[in-house]
Amino acid sequence: MISLATARERWTSFLGCFVAVALGVAVVTMSALVLLSDGAKVPERLAGAPVLVQSPAGTQTGGVFTENPPWAPQSAEELRRELARLPGVVDAVPDRSFYAQAADTEQRRGERQGHPWSAAALAEYGLSEGRPPVTADEIVVDRSLGFTPGEPVTVLTARGPQRFSVSGTMNGPGYYVTDRWAAELAGGVRTIGLLLESGTDATRVAAAARRAVGGDGTVLTGASREALAPKQDEMTRWIGGQVLTAIALLSAFVTVFVVSSTFAFAVAGRRREFGLLRTIGATPRQLKRLVYGEALAVGAVGAAAGALLGVVLAPTMTGVLIDAGFQPAGFEVSLRWWVPVAAFATGVVVALVGVGAASRRASRVKPLEAMREAAVDNRPMTRRRRVAGLAATGVGAVCSVGTAFAGADALVLLALGTAMSLTTGLTLLAPGLVGPVIGALTRPLARHPGAPAVLVRENMITAVRRTSATVAPVLATVAFAVLITSTVQTTQNADTARQAAAVRAEAAVVPRGTPGLSDAAVARVEGASLLSTTVYGGDGRAALSAAGVSSAFERVYAVPPPQGDTVVVTAAVAAAHGWRKGQVASLTLEDGRTRRLRVTAVVDDSMPYQVFLPRDVVRDHDPSALADVAYRTTPAPTPLPAGLSADEISVEAYAASDDAEEDRLVWIFTLLLVAVSAGYTAIAVASTVLTATAGRVRDVRVLRLSGATPRQVLLTLAAETCCVVALGAALGLAAAAPALFGTVHGLREELGLPVELSLAWPWLTGVVAGCLLLGTAATVLPARVVLRRLP
């Protein structure tokens, strides 16, 4: 017959497993629903054209999203004419874009574009008031900007601020000028929209357009026009996908960890019950089936609740991702019935996998365990566990050594492997480490030889399994929290130092509220500027980041600048395309024209761009290009009028802020990962401590009968929890330390700079304090209830 205390202990452990499985399945369901939702929409400014023709795609690399290479000017015009002659087509309109932004506004990336007025026919919106632009100083703007026809407006362009008169307003984003003025500011043509006669079948026109285009483009109609959504949105969705995938995998892994540790501790506490079942004839197979049945029941209920919770919270999670920058604005999640079903099945499988070791341990209980009264763990470490723990620790040690000598690509993987292996190894070896480590940590208690101090020390050393089960989740959380946050912080500081050390300049002029510096702003700076653009090289016309530089480039980067028909490339680009110094490289530029340029130098891959061209070459072929930064090389500060939207800052400050948006996303990603792992730790710690406290009612009763006051009982339990959390934190730091020191050494070798370890103390303190607070609350509060019920 099962006692009330045993039943309470069992249901407490079941509750922890239920919550772990439910949360894991909820996270997997939400992540899968968002990942499988396309979320892309046809751009408003092109949605009015039933058929769109897109230029052929170039070679794309993972995580890098660039626009397709434009058609050559002559090819684009010939294709436009041929498409315009198709039956049912009223006109074929080329779409061009250039940088435009009303002064003193900070708009989203997709709204910082100007177009020729002819392209307004492709939009699904039209004029709200006023008329189209007729002269070069007239412009049509989005009415949400607050301008009315006849008002003057200053628009920032690549040339500098331009004064216009508003001739009309539209019900959608964008700036529209005369076609002639747009041709001077815009680059090449990537899209041609077909306007059809009323009643014309778009499918039939699309089929005819495909025959006319052949391999020179892609014909899009209907929902396939979503492929023309801004590449920035595609990149944002890709980043969000990486975040969701990492969170889902981490949730599945930690769910197995929590279920396994919780059931292992529960089985260890039910040895007497299992021994009694063996005494009355139960076979080992029946005991194993019993544990699996309990896990199946808990897993099924938890998975069902988690799948339902994931479906309900998926829209809320989508909103959070949009606000954080991991999904584009307007993204919507679509529900698919099979996703929660698959997540439910995954949750059940995870619960059964997690209980495997516990079921084997239950099947090995002997009938004599029914006679056992003491909570002493005579054999907390089995030979198999000791071998597995030493093997995992050895793998972690090898990975830590490899981290110190690995390159940049393998550095992160080896660091993560070091932490995971050491965490697993120390968790397996924890029962053997508890005695010596607890002895060292509780040595100060020996100076106060009172009953509570003795009980704290002996309880932890005697009940090794209980102590180890509580240590494990704290160890894992501290290890991963310290590793992730400190690695990110150390890497960012090292990257900032690398960028600052590579530049020889007095100061940096950077854009304020705009995506780049105009020619007017750059002209004020006595030094070197980097005119950002994209070029396409090789047979696959791979997109390459490029910059136009002037003669002052050599003073800043100590690299001879390209001049005339020459180009400078990085070593990785040269190796990928087979370019060597003195050879000729064929590059397609932003207006679609191809130029053959001689390679004059091959530079290190640490340079900020892959290709460097003469500045006038970039400006001739990309009228809308903007400079990311201009470095001042003279002692005197640069006077910058407010209308140029630029500021002068130190080189170190620019290096720290250069990747500010990327760093923000990285830290949000880090926060999400730490929050997920810390959340599961809260479940594991609370479940384990509650289970342990529920099973210690008899210990509390004995303490009271022995003369201990309620305050002494609570102090004993709280002190024991504090020591266990301290042990977990110490082992967690021990697991993360080799990976961190190896990473620092690897960065020093890779960058050739004095990189210092930067520990994220606020994160470490917060995680340890959270574990301590939660563990203490989960111990003291139930104990207070027990004390009130005792006579």
Residue ranges and their predicted role:
Residues 420, 425-426, 432-576, 581-594:
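Juxtamembrane segments of multi-pass membrane proteins
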Residues 1, 364-379, 785-791:
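Short cytosolic juxtamembrane segments of multi-pass membrane proteins
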Residues 467, 628-631, 645-784, 790-791:
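C-terminal transmembrane helical bundles of large multi-pass transporters
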